[in-house]
Amino acid sequence: MTKAEIITEISSKTGIEKVDVQEVVEAFFKVVKNSMINGENVYVRGFGSFVVKKRAEKTARNISKNTAIIIPEHFVPSFKPAKVFVEKVKTGNK
């Protein structure tokens, strides 16, 4: 399902204009992105958590030149679904 399909679905279920739904969806994504950029996690009860994970520095190999390279410590965005959400997906796809 794409973002456009989500907007259409929400619009049809709520009766709210697509333009208004799009603004709300875009604002939600913007808040999540900005929070994570600032190192804050976002928790949505019953859905899941958008968390910032720290990746440690590690040594990797450049196989074309056969040299070792250092990948510095960095942060990556991650999503951890809520247990309720995981259970519904497990039982719903039969």
List the predicted regions and their residue ranges.
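Strongly charged
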Residues: M1-K94
